């Protein structure tokens, strides 16, 4: 203290606490004023003073001194309640995962902070001399944060990656931690069990790699002679004075500095504190300094480009190993801070916002023009203030004004009533914590399987134009519509089509059948079906076998030969619907093993489901026309007028279409039974040709004849055909052309044995053999078939109670399958006559096709199959029926029918089974979806377990509507309708009927003719969204009309239409907990599928909220599996205040990995530069200059990135250390494959200067481009293979070096250490015998004064040294 005493008159006495920062400043000023010797003497005295005071105080620390804060319990309870509420909001889809994490962190951080702030007053009041209290503010050991962990709560911890663990440690160290809290604490704490080893090794490995890259960099020369420099300017305000000073001190000027005409500093002068202060004072022009980047050599560095040595304030000495110093300077802070004994233990530190609260109850008023709506970072709605906003709170007798600063959130609305102490605004935390912010990505993963939907527009990310990455422009929900996905590994599986009905669980059980990709599709199909339909399954759980499937979906096989003969009249069927036909198919019978439609109708639908006009839709095989035995057909025909000009059966785009040349009327026709046996050639036949046998004669070893008669044997194509003609044989004297039918009562009257025939007979003339001339006559019995009336197929269809225009119709057509008048049929089961349904619609319509699809509905075990046919959509004009009112809103301006845009398929069942609310959970609809793997097709099975019904809402009040309850006898089978997705939802509306009323209270029911309908059936009032997203409405009656464009209810009045807002609209996504009825919120989120008067049916869905800028992975409608990445958020988060959170960042920058939200653009920038420069300068110089400019640009960017990380952690590292490292990782270029050169192979990494020199020597362009190497890759691409081998991959490096015959010139330190030589630094450094002559430098310097650009170009292109 004597020194201070000596200069007392000039000193000011400071009476304040000196903390660590003040002590640093004090020591710094001592060194400046008195030098190092005096300073150390003074500090010794300060140390002694401190020890004496501490001894006198004799403070000790016992466990009883740790006093827990009393208010902790209820503060923690409050935080837990907020967390539970937050979890609910996230589940409802009100906040997304990042907002939830952020808010959770801030809830606990605020709780922790309140506790910390309460700690000091608590100690001050209860025990002011508590040793813990005294120590925590002494600045010597420990701080408030650590004491808070002892007596408050440990709070939130960060894991080794710096991510926050959102489970807080609620205990403090005095109370002790639970097991979970201890493990979290181990992860987060700097001294934790887990952390210490990890961090030390990380920092050590980083140092090792850094040293490896630059170990050969030694100061070899005094001056390399460069004229280039990097300009530094404080003028633009981008650089703080502190950073500006730090950048300049210790550097060497690359050019003279002038103020006006006066030179205040010369080239090659090193910069000290005085010179820097002069620059700042005079605000000199941009200052050009020399840096390691501007040094001309890549393998060493010169004194002037390096500058002053950090150890002693003088130019660095020759032979100094500056590379190793640089590597250790960057790696060391990580190691040092990892091993620090005193730390807050990884506890999260961040800023919270200040709240403005209302001082009393009152009404809020502010200018709404100065705010705009937004979301807070917690997902709450708020107003953002763009500038100072004055908010007035008015009570009865008090008016209070509050000024809200800009960038703050206003949490209340204008004219809202607020209570005392209610938070009305949130002022963002000051910018002090901004340097602890970083941008990170957060991936959200799907926790359920299903189909992806979103309800907003999305943009393609520019770099992924054809990918499945989409950017959200605004806040919206992503929905996962639930359903069980099933993925086939074999590519398109042809047995399932979109909208097929399936058993939902059977596929998942049998997945293993479709796992081997080597088997063919047919094998799989066979296995697939044999596994399902072998009869092991319970009845009712099966789907048709393969042949039946072919019949149902008509794979092209058709049983029609010549369908040329039509039955007389073509009746129109009873069932006519506007643009659609619904055909229900009967359920399978008990014990039967085949799926048949009602009455044996076979439906033939092409695979693509598209039917043309006059297509055969279905055929019916009447059992009366089925013969179990083989035989021949015979009939006589009469030609009628031709009905269609086209000829015969035409196959048009895979659809069989009836276009017969003429129509024949047949009445009656005949079947002649003949027994036929088809035998193998090797069979031993026991009867002879032309022999006559009796009934039950042995024909072969294992066959007997069923009838007696004439035997004929024919050989055909390795088969033997054995035919037995029953009947009598006659040998008439005179044979005419005896091929004729004799009706009953016929015969020769003059014959002796004349008797009246009872049955039809067929007379056939035959020869015994081909060569004989003699004939005999075979008289055979005949089975006659009379023309019957077409079966009444009308009973297939429900009665059409809804009056509609007749657009789509079916015709019944009978025809004989076998057109040839005498045709042998050798099948054992023959259908002689087939009844067809032919699809037709009005000729004046321009529609060319109709779409058909199968629907299978199951209700409590009862299966109903339906075929649905819709005409393709087209703007059909709608003519109003006579009951339509003029203002009904059905006819739009352009005259097109609004209802036609969404044709509804109403599906009805007359089954008497009681339908309950419980649904069969195992039946579902297959929905074919897009899969990320292009080769395989994904199916999603939507079963009724994924749907739920909400309602009935009997208390919903519609204006102007009176409800009449119609009591029905519940035992009467009700007319019900089956819903979508194969579920048996009873979508009927049982006891509500709406009358419409005009203003004068006159019932308009009579006008609408609803009274009669009431007696017949219950009007269905519901709307349906099918699996394809089309909206259907049953157009049941005119009392409630859906406008598909606005999706609002319309209530119809006598002369005007009043629109009332809808409660829910079709296809709308509802979040959980949304109130849609008075009963309270509904309990599931999902999409509205069916809209009824009293209830809605929704398909379960899981909402995920996403904010603008989020990246959505996947396409609309794509299947997502559990655990798939759904969306990626990019958000800012507060960083833990430890250096090593930054260490991985440093490593990422130096290893040139992507760290930004949008990947690090340096490499893209490099490609862009190369292209532009080549275009501007042409080939020869373009590569060199392009690479050079790119490298300069990326070097500065990399240095700034590394410095930003370290500065944010409060660590000071001189730029030159980072520059030496960055110079090494940016000094190589990659030889490209644009043009082959004789010197370097494509893909080879070479130094930029070497490439340029080689190109100049060869006088040809070498194509290359700049690359950014990471430090690891740079270490493996040096001139020394010994150095590379000692780093990693030793065997590979040595083997490659041996093969290439590489030479190591032992220029670096490491290779000399390995071989035991003297290292070329320090005393082992050989000074060059003579400094090279400086003429080029002088010339270049003069040139630069004349023309700066010319000098720089010459420097780049010509002046280089090895």
Curated annotation (Swiss-Prot):
Keywords: Chloroplast, DNA-directed RNA polymerase, Metal-binding, Nucleotidyltransferase, Plastid, Transcription, Transferase, Zinc. Its main location: plastid. GO terms for biological process: DNA-templated transcription. It catalyses: RNA(n) + a ribonucleoside 5'-triphosphate = RNA(n+1) + diphosphate. Its EC number is 2.7.7.6. It is found in: Plastid, Chloroplast. Zn(2+) binds at residues 224, 295, 302, 305. DNA-dependent RNA polymerase catalyzes the transcription of DNA into RNA using the four ribonucleoside triphosphates as substrates. This is DNA-directed RNA polymerase subunit beta''. It comes from Helianthus annuus (Common sunflower). The gene is rpoC2.
């Amino acid at each position: 203290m004597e020194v201070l005493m000596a200069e007392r008159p000039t000193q000011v006495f400071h009476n304040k606490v000196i903390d660590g920062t003040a002590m640093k400043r004090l020591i710094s000023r001592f060194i400046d004023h008195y030098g190092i010797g005096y300073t150390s003497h003074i500090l010794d005295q300060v140390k002694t003073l401190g020890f004496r005071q501490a001894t006198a105080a004799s403070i000790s620390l016992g466990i009883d001194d740790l006093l827990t804060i009393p208010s902790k319990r209820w503060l923690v309870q409050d935080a837990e309640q907020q967390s539970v509420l937050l979890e609910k909001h996230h589940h409802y889809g009100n906040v997304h995962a990042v907002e939830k994490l952020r808010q959770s962190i801030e809830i606990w951080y605020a709780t922790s902070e309140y506790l910390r702030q309460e700690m000091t007053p608590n100690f001050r009041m209860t025990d002011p001399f508590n040793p813990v209290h005294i120590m925590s503010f002494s600045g010597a050991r420990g701080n408030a944060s650590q004491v808070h962990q002892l007596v408050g709560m440990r709070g939130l911890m960060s894991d080794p990656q710096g991510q926050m663990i959102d489970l807080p440690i609620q205990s403090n160290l005095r109370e002790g931690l639970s097991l979970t809290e201890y493990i979290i604490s181990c992860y987060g704490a700097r001294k934790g069990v887990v952390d210490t080893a990890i961090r030390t090794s990380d920092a050590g490995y980083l140092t090792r790699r850094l040293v490896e890259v630059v170990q050969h960099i030694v100061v070899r020369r005094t001056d390399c002679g460069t004229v280039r420099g990097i300009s530094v300017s404080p003028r633009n305000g981008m650089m703080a004075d502190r950073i500006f000073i730090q950048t300049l001190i210790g550097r060497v000027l690359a050019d003279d500095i002038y103020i006006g005409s006066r030179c205040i500093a010369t080239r090659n002068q090193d910069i000290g504190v005085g010179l820097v202060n002069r620059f700042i004072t005079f605000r000199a022009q941009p200052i050009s300094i020399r840096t390691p980047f501007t040094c001309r050599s890549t393998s060493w560095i010169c004194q002037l480009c390096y500058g002053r040595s950090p150890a002693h304030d003088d130019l660095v000495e020759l032979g100094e190993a500056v590379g190793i110093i640089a590597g250790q300077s960057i790696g060391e802070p990580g190691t040092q801070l990892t091993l620090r004994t005193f730390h807050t233990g990884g506890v999260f530190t961040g800023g919270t916002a200040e709240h403005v609260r209302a001082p009393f109850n009152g009404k809020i008023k502010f200018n709404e023009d100065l705010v705009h709506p937004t979301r807070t970072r917690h997902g709450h709605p708020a107003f953002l203030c763009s500038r100072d906003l004055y908010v007035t709170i008015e009570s009865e007798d008090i008016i209070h004004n509050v000024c809200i600063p800009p960038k703050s959130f206003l949490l209340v609305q204008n004219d809202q009533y607020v209570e005392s102490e209610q938070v009305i605004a949130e002022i963002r935390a000051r910018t002090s914590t901004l340097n602890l912010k970083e941008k990170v990505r957060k991936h959200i993963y799907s926790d359920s399987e299903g189909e992806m939907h979103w309800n907003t527009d999305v943009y393609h990310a520019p770099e992924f134009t054809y990918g499945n990455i989409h950017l959200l422009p605004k806040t919206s929900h992503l929905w996962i519509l639930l359903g069980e996905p099933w993925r086939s590994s074999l590519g398109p599986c042809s047995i399932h089509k979109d909208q097929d009905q399936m058993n939902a669980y059977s596929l998942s059980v049998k997945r293993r059948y479709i796992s081997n990709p080597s088997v063919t599709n047919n094998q799989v199909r066979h296995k697939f079906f044999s596994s399902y339909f072998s009869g092991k399954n319970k009845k009712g759980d099966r789907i048709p076998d393969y042949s039946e499937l072919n019949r149902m979906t008509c794979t092209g096989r058709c049983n029609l030969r010549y369908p040329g003969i039509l039955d007389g009249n073509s009746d129109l069927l009873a069932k006519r619907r506007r643009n659609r036909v619904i055909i229900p198919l009967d359920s399978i019978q008990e014990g039967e093993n085949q799926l048949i439609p009602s009455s044996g109708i076979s439906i033939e639908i092409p695979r693509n489901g598209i039917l043309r006009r006059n297509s055969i839709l279905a055929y019916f095989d009447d059992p009366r026309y089925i013969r179990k035995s083989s035989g021949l057909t015979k009939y006589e025909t009469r030609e009628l007028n031709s009905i269609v000009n086209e000829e015969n059966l035409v196959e048009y785009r895979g659809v069989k279409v009836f276009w017969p040349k003429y129509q024949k009327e047949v009445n009656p026709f005949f079947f002649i039974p003949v027994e036929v046996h088809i035998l193998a050639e090797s069979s031993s036949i026991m009867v002879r040709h032309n022999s006559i046998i009796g009934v039950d004669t042995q024909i072969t070893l294992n066959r007997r004849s069923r009838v007696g008669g004439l035997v004929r044997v024919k050989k055909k194509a390795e088969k033997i055909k054995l035919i037995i003609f029953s009947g009598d044989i006659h040998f008439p004297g005179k044979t005419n052309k005896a091929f004729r039918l004799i009706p009953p009562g016929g015969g020769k009257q003059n014959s002796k044995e004349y008797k009246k025939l009872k049955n039809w007979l067929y007379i056939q003339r035959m020869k015994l053999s081909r060569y004989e001339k003699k004939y005999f006559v075979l008289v055979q019995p005949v089975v006659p078939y009379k023309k019957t009336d077409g079966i009444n197929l009308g009973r297939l269809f429900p009665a059409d109670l809804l009056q509609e225009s007749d657009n789509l119709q079916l015709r019944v057509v009978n025809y004989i399958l076998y057109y040839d008048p005498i045709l042998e049929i050798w099948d054992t089961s023959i259908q002689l006559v087939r009844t067809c349904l032919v699809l037709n619609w009005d000729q004046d319509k321009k529609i060319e096709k109709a779409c058909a699809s199968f629907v299978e509905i199951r209700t409590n075990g009862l299966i109903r199959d339906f075929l649905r046919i819709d005409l393709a959509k087209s703007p059909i004009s709608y003519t109003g029926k006579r009951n339509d009112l003029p203002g009904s809103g059905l006819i739009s301006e352009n005259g097109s029918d609004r209802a036609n845009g969404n044709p509804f398929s109403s599906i009805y069942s007359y089954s008497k089974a009681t339908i309950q609310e419980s649904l069969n959970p195992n039946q579902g609809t297959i929905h074919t979806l897009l899969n990320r793997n292009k080769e395989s097709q994904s199916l999603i099975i939507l079963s009724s377990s994924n749907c739920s019904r909400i309602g009935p809402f009997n208390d919903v009040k519609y204006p102007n509507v009176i409800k009449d309850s119609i009591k029905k006898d519940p035992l009467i089978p009700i007319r019900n309708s089956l819903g979508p997705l194969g579920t048996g939802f009873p979508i009927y509306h049982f006891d509500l009927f709406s009358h419409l009323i005009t203003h004068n209270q006159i019932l308009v029911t009579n006008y609408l003719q609803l009274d009669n309908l009431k007696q017949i059936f219950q009007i269905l009032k519901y709307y349906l969204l099918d699996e394809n997203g089309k909206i259907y409405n049953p157009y049941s009656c005119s009392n409630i009309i859906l406008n598909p464009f606005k999706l609002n209810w319309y209530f119809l009045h006598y002369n005007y239409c009043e629109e009332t807002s809808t409660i829910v609209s079709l296809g709308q996504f509802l979040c959980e907990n949304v109130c849609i009825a008075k009963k309270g919120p509904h309990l599931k989120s999902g999409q509205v599928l069916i809209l009824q008067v009293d209830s809605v049916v929704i398909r379960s869905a899981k909402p995920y909220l996403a904010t603008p800028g989020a990246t959505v992975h996947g396409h609309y409608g794509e299947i997502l599996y559990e655990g798939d990445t759904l969306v990626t958020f990019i958000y800012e988060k507060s960083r833990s205040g430890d250096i090593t959170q930054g260490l991985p960042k440093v490593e990422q920058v130096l290893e040139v990995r992507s760290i930004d939200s949008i990947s690090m653009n340096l490499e893209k920038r490099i490609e862009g530069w190369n292209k532009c420069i080549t275009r501007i300068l042409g080939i020869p110089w373009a590569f060199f200059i392009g690479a050079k400019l790119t490298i300069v640009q990326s070097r500065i960017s990399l240095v700034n990135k590394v410095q930003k990380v370290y500065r944010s952690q409060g660590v000071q590292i001189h730029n030159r250390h980072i520059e030496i490292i960055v110079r090494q990782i940016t000094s190589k270029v990659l030889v490209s494959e644009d043009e082959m050169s004789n010197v370097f192979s494509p893909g080879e990494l070479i130094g930029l200067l070497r490439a340029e020199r080689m190109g100049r020597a060869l006088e040809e362009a070498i194509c290359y481009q700049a690359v950014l190497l990471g430090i690891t890759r740079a270490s493996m691409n040096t001139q020394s293979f010994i150095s590379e081998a000692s780093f990693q991959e030793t065997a590979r490096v040595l083997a490659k070096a041996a093969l290439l015959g590489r030479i190591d010139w032992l220029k670096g330190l490491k290779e000399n250490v390995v071989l035991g030589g003297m290292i070329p630094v320090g005393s082992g450094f050989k000074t060059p015998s003579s400094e090279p002559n400086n003429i080029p430098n002088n010339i270049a310097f003069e040139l630069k004064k004349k023309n700066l650009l010319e000098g720089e170009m010459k420097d780049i292109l010509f002046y280089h040294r090895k």
